[in-house]
Amino acid sequence: MHRRDTGQPIRDAIADAGLSIERLAEKTKDVDPLGYGISRSAIGHMVSTGPSGRDEFEDRSCDLVARALDKPIEELFNGNAPT
């Protein structure tokens, strides 16, 4: 899946939830049935607008971030080309 608008919806959702990247990473473990979650660095790639920013991510990672933020996945990511 691809992040929307270079990650702005993700950054907004993190801010609205009052979370840090570290706390969001912890929350992804809470919502992961396997208990693994995703790393702080992976979330950093999702939200970065600089050289470390990435546009494409595994579906599982996107799902965990959306669930941890209590947002529909479609608000944060899409399955098509980057927007």
Label each region the model flagged.
Residues 57-75:
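DNA major-groove recognition helix of helix-turn-helix/homeodomain DNA-binding modules
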